[in-house]
């Protein structure tokens, strides 16, 4: 029977309670992580296994050529990992101006010249080396099995796959890898990715070295050269992920932690710092005043982020200056409760997407995200090993007169990144690992869901399920069709220019949440998984 895969009725999800939990946007990935825990592995082992599986089961969102970030609570402290890769050695402004013209504002959105060094696999290895209990090769076994035997394509993945196909079918390796019948798979159709199984085996056997100096690196260099690119095995061999200290912002008695720039996580911190100057709880949770204040705070945050955030060594201001309480209080004063505004960047200088999370009964928690950037990334797939390559290079600027000169492309430099894991603590102790994927929706989702939990005491699943808005540019925002009509009317009356979106799968991100209930070995955790994706939280 051919079923109709449109869903006219609202579905309710409830939180999951368990002592060991994996929450992801695909059930097979969550189950792979749980298998690692049942074998004696910890939360980090589970996250790596889930991350590997999801490169196979959600190829629109990530692949073996992705970037990644993580925040880990190791039982004593938080540790951050930046596994985003840099530009190839040949990527100068002149390189792009000669190939694409001096008036091109960015490197290409698709194709081989949008590919920076992929960092996700190196991130898996770094996490395994520092925290893992199981052999690295064991963690990739579920992904290898799925790549070889195949899986049935779920609803949301299929929608995104089909939507991306017209733009990408002509990119090198794309049709061969992702259009086996000359089209995107249908919902419930079996898809195999046997070349990626070969790549996964090589990565497992070499503990990642095949991709960073071995047979896969050589294949990527040959493929890149054949299609006019410049990434080399030497670029790949030079790469190492970076351990970083998360940056933080206090809010309502808790502390939110994000990975520091070159990522946009600081936007969520800025917005919360601005909102701390308002009594949100005095306004209705879904009312126009609360939503208006959140939208305006997010606009102010993005104004500064798009102006200043880049590779840290090239930034004109520091994260500390951008988060200075006095500066954020001054930005809060710009908000007019009765009028939407288009804000410009301030001057903070003074004297001075997939997401998954796992937690285990021994207290280890990990907030992890990896992404190809736009759907299927560059669209380019190295065919021998099934390496689907990201397009993070498009995040650079090639415009000498652009808004953010600190983000100009340069050899060995990392571009502005959108993917951000988050972690919440209270008095130095872990409370919640969470994230909301979806380009610039990520910090907006971090802020909106956290406000619902901390200001309005909504549980993580309710906060996750609630209608969202998404700021775009200027006065324009997208709002989910489920938002209260009175609130929508009230926002319009204040000058917000709104597009009502019926298809929530495309525009509003998707989150996964694990909230620590007490002693992990006794009370355990509460988990939530976003209904806007195919995923689930699983545990025991």
Tell what function each PLM region has.
Residues 265-281, 424-432, 440-464:
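M16/insulysin-pitrilysin zinc metalloprotease superfamily fold
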Residues 257-265, 353-357, 367-380, 436-443:
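Glycine-rich phosphate/pyrophosphate-binding beta-alpha loops
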Residues 412-414, 446, 455-506:
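Extended C-terminal subregions enriched in glycine
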Residues 56-73, 77-82, 230-232, 364-432, ...:
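Active-site rim segments in enzyme catalytic domains, especially the processed small/beta chain
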Residues 277-372, 384-385, 392, 502:
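Internal maturation/activation junctions in enzymes
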Residues 1-31, 35, 43-213, 217-263, ...:
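Noncatalytic scaffold domains of N-terminal-nucleophile
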Residues 243, 350-353, 417-419:
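Short, small/polar residue-rich loop motifs at catalytic or cofactor-binding pockets
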């Amino acid at each position: 029977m051919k079923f109709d895969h449109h869903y006219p009725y609202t579905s309710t999800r409830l939180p999951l309670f368990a002592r060991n939990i994996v929450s992801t946007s695909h059930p097979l990935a969550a189950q792979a992580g749980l298998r690692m825990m049942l074998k004696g592995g910890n939360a980090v082992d589970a996250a790596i296994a889930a991350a590997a599986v999801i490169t196979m089961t959600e190829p629109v969102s990530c692949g073996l050529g992705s970037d990644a970030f993580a925040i880990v609570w190791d039982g004593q402290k938080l540790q951050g990992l930046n596994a985003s890769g840099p530009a190839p050695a040949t990527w100068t402004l002149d390189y792009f101006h000669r190939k694409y013209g001096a008036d091109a504002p960015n490197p290409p959105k698709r194709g081989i010249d949008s590919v920076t060094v992929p960092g996700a696999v190196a991130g898996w290895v770094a996490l395994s080396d520092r925290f893992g209990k199981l052999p690295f090769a064991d963690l990739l076994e579920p992904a290898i099995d799925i790549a070889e035997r195949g899986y049935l394509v779920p609803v949301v993945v299929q929608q995104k796959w089909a939507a991306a196909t017209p733009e990408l079918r002509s990119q090198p390796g794309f049709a061969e890898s992702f259009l086996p019948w000359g089209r995107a798979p249908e919902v419930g159709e079996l898809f195999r990715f046997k070349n990626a199984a070969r790549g996964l085996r090589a990565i497992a056997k070499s503990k990642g070295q095949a991709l960073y100096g071995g047979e896969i690196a050589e294949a990527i260099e040959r493929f890149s050269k054949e299609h006019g690119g410049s990434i080399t095995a030497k670029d790949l061999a030079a790469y190492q992920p970076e351990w970083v200290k998360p940056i933080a912002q206090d809010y309502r008695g808790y502390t939110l932690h994000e990975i520091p720039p070159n990522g946009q996580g600081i936007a969520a911190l800025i917005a919360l710092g601005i909102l701390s100057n308002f009594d949100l709880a005095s306004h209705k949770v879904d009312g126009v005043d609360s939503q208006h204040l959140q939208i305006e705070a997010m606009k102010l945050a993005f104004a500064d982020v798009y102006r200043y955030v880049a590779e840290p060594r090239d930034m004109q201001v520091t994260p500390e200056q951008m988060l200075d309480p006095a500066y954020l209080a001054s930005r809060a004063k710009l908000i007019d409760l009765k009028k939407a505004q288009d804000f410009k960047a301030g001057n903070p200088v003074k004297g001075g997407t997939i997401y998954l999370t796992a937690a285990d009964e021994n207290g280890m928690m990990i907030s992890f995200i990896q992404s190809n950037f736009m759907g299927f990334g560059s669209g380019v797939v190295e065919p021998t090993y099934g390496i689907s390559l990201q397009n993070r290079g498009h995040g650079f600027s090639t415009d000498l007169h652009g808004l953010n000169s600190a983000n100009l492309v340069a050899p060995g430099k990392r571009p502005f990144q959108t993917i951000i894991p988050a972690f919440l603590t209270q008095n130095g102790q872990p409370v919640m690992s969470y994230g909301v994927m979806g380009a610039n929706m990520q910090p907006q989702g971090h802020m909106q869901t956290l406000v619902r939990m901390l200001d309005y005491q909504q549980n993580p699943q309710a906060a996750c399920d609630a209608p969202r808005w998404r700021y775009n540019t200027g006065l324009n925002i997208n709002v989910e069709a489920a938002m209260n009509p009175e609130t929508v009317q009230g926002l319009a009356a204040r000058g917000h220019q709104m597009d009502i979106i019926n298809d929530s799968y495309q525009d509003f991100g998707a989150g996964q949440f694990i909230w620590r209930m007490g002693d992990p070995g006794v009370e355990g955790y509460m988990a939530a998984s976003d209904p806007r994706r195919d995923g689930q939280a699983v545990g025991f």
